[in-house]
Every structure is written in structure tokens, then in C-alpha cells.
């Protein structure tokens, strides 16, 4: 088994408010959660996710990352995967603490709202445990599809990360 995954069950929709005004609409109380062991030091694993050069090694083509809170992350894919996907995504970086934690926001697959991705890197004797959580999906049919797409997408992405860092295999 490459890692462990959990889909947090819904406890009902949540509405986010600021000064009694709705700012994001109704969101699902569902989270994509994955964790996997990567047999490498936390700095190496972190840099493979939180730098443009690192992302381009295994996942993207031409990614850019300003790895500070308030910076931006920008993913670019060209002819990626079986569908030869070409596209871009990105958003603000909320937290960047090398080699422990990286948090950013980016567009859901539908492109109509942002989700939050939190990635923690925990050193263990045999390498680094990468724990990823993504949340903030709209409570709608489109939001559910975005959620399901990310469940499968992150499963593939963390497997690709593991194979790249441990064995130098690039997809």
C-alpha cells in the first residue's frame, strides 16, 4: 500500500460568514485526506512540492512558486497524463514553513471557487510522512464532482511524488 486515505463524512453544510455577510456560500463539510510515507528527508520532499523546480520534476511543466506566506503558486501542465491534459491552476500561499508545512489555495476543478490544501511533512525514522488535506468544496452537484475529482487526483499525485523522490521515476 502506498498510503492511507480518508474521506471525512459530511456533518451537514457549513456557511462561512464575515461581519454577518456570507463570503463564500455554502460549502460541504468534506475533506480529502491522504497520507503516505516517502523514504527521503523532509527537506527533499518539501522542495518537491513547494518549489517550481521540484514540481516540474514529477508533476508539472513550468510551475512557479513564491514560497512565502502571501506569495503565489502557479501550476502548469502540458500533455499531462493519459488525457494529455493541458491547463493551469494556482492561487495564494497561506503558509510556507520549510520543511514542515505548506498551505495554499487554488481553484476547484470547475474553476468557480477556491479550495484550501494543507500539506504537513513529519520526519520519521524511515523518511517523511506526507499528510495532505483539501477542503472548501461547494455543497452542490458541481462541488461534489470537484471533490471526487480531487480524491482521485491527489491519490495519483502523491503516488507520483513518492515514486519520483524515492526512485527518480517521472510520469
What are these regions (language model features)?
Residues 13-65:
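Hydrophobic ligand-binding cavity/cleft-lining segments
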Residues 33-34, 40, 53-88, 92, ...:
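Short beta-edge strand/loop motif at the mouth of beta-sheet-based domains
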Residues 36, 89-94, 115-123:
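Hydrophobic/aromatic beta-strand elements that line small-molecule binding cavities or substrate pockets
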Residues 45-46, 55, 73-75, 93, ...:
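Hydrophobic pocket/interface hotspot
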Residues 109-156:
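Beta-strand/loop substructures that line and gate deep hydrophobic ligand-binding cavities in soluble
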Residues 163-171:
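Short, highly charged C-terminal tails/helix-capping segments
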Amino acid at each position: 500500500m502506498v498510503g492511507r486515505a480518508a474521506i471525512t463524512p459530511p456533518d451537514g453544510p457549513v456557511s462561512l460568514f464575515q461581519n454577518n455577510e456570507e463570503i463564500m456560500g455554502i460549502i460541504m463539510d468534506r475533506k480529502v485526506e491522504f497520507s503516505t510515507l516517502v523514504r527521503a528527508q523532509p527537506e527533499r520532499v518539501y522542495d518537491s512540492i513547494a518549489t517550481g523546480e521540484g514540481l516540474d520534476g514529477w508533476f508539472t511543466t513550468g510551475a512557479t512558486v513564491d514560497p512565502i506566506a502571501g506569495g503565489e503558486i502557479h501550476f502548469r501542465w502540458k500533455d499531462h497524463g493519459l488525457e494529455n491534459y493541458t491547463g493551469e491552476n494556482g492561487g495564494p500561499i497561506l503558509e510556507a514553513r520549510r520543511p514542515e508545512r505548506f498551505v495554499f489555495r487554488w481553484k476547484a476543478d470547475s474553476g468557480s471557487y477556491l479550495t484550501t490544501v494543507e500539506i504537513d511533512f513529519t520526519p520519521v525514522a524511515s523518511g517523511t510522512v506526507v499528510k495532505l488535506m483539501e477542503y472548501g468544496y461547494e455543497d452542490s452537484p458541481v462541488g461534489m464532482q470537484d471533490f471526487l475529482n480531487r480524491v482521485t487526483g491527489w491519490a495519483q499525485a502523491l503516488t507520483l511524488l513518492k515514486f519520483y523522490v524515492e526512485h527518480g521515476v517521472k510520469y
